[in-house]
């Protein structure tokens, strides 16, 4: 009963910022569909996030297909109803749209479909839902849903097509959602956006993907007007007093395919090569090998850490692993893949590469550096006795 709704909203995610990823991935799916239907041309799709700290308000709006008025209640109002396909769509469980209920007083969905002169609105009393969830009463899921949802319509310009999610009166304990700097930093590695054009090695990534016949999905996403990019750079920095200074750089990229015994590509990756001076400090937000499905990051920068010979190995590198196989299915928290045979093969292949190639790269670099350091110390002592 009501426990299902609790699990799908307040109990689903440990990091409140995940709501942005959920709503953005839904918007990206609809942008893809809008391009397929000819509503948008490639490159015309946008997702705009607006946040007002004083009003504790957030809006996430796309210019994609929108939802037809006749389909609105069934598509948006039916819990976990989803017509999306595993392996094709970025979001496929249909539960992501509920995540905002945990973090605000009122959650509102507004949409209009091209050619229709009406906009459909669903308003959810999120505060009431949370109160009913903790009451000592045996509410059914339907009891709660019927009590918190209202539908309405209004006139709209037939030329308009969009879907908007609005969150009113963000909870005091979820103020992080209104921290524009933190949200932009979070989104820059999680959502499917382009590399920043100052990352000069990006052309090699696109060229390699093209050679494989793999399309890296990228969308224009803005936060209060600022476009979000993946914040990769060739410079590796370290703290030096109050400032940051460059201590190493990524000189080139190495690429690796991962294929099963039938020769089918299940994943591929790029990794940045440097002098491997040391473990990359935390001030480099891009550090670590990240795993991506449909160009959306799964988990954090440590998702693949357990596949290294030693945990610290992950942070000697910068790079991305792109899942290709449709059988690599993100779990409901989107922090890794569901367990299945393909995941076992994926992990075996990565573990072998991480052990045989990457571990040796930084281990040998460390050994040579330490040998050189010992040599310099010895020479210094020799010169003292001259």
Regions found by a protein language model. Give the residues of each.
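Generic recognition of stable, solvent-exposed alpha-helical segments in well-folded globular domains
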Residues: 3, 18, 22, 67, ...
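Alpha-helical oligomerization interfaces and scaffolds
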Residues: 10, 47-48, 54-61, 165, ...
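Glycine-rich ATP-binding loops of the HATPase_c
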Residues: 106-110
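Glycine-rich phosphate-binding loop
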Residues: 85-104
């Amino acid at each position: 009963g009501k426990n299902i709704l609790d699990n799908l909203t307040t109990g689903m995610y440990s990091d409140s910022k995940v709501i942005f990823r959920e709503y953005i991935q839904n918007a990206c799916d609809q942008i893809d569909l809008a391009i397929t239907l000819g509503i948008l041309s490639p490159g015309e799709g946008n997702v705009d996030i607006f946040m007002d700290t004083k009003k504790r308000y957030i809006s996430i709006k796309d210019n994609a297909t929108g939802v037809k008025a006749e389909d609105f209640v069934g598509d948006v109002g039916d819990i976990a109803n989803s017509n999306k396909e595993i392996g094709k769509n970025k979001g496929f469980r249909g539960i992501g749209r509920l995540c905002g209920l945990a973090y605000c007083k009122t959650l509102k969905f507004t949409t209009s479909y091209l050619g229709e002169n009406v906009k459909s609105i669903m308003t959810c009393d999120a505060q009431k839902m949370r109160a009913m969830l903790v009451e000592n009463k045996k509410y059914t899921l339907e009891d709660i849903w019927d009590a918190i949802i209202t539908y309405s319509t209004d006139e709209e310009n037939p030329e308009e097509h969009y879907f908007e999610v609005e969150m009113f009166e963000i909870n005091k304990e979820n103020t992080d959602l209104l921290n524009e700097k933190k949200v932009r930093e979070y989104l820059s590695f999680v959502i499917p956006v382009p590399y920043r054009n100052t990352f000069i090695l990006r052309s090699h990534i696109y060229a390699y993907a093209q050679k494989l016949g793999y399309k890296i999905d990228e969308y224009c996403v803005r936060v209060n007007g600022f476009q979000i990019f993946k914040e990769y750079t060739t410079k590796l920095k370290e703290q030096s007093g109050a400032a940051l200074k460059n201590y190493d750089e990524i000189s080139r990229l190495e690429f690796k395919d991962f294929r099963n015994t039938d020769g089918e590509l299940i994943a591929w990756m790029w990794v940045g090569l440097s002098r491997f001076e040391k473990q990359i400090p935390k001030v480099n937000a891009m550090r670590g090998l990240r795993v991506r499905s449909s160009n959306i990051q799964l988990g954090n920068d440590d998702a693949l850490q357990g596949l290294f010979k030693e945990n610290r190995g992950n942070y000697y590198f910068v790079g991305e692993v792109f899942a290709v196989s449709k059988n690599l299915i993100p779990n409901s928290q989107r922090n890794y893949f569901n367990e299945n045979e393909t995941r076992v093969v994926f992990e075996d292949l990565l573990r072998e590469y991480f052990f045989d190639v990457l571990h040796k790269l930084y281990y040998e670099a460390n050994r040579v550096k330490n040998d050189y350091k010992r040599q310099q110390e010895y020479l210094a002592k020799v010169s003292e006795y001259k």
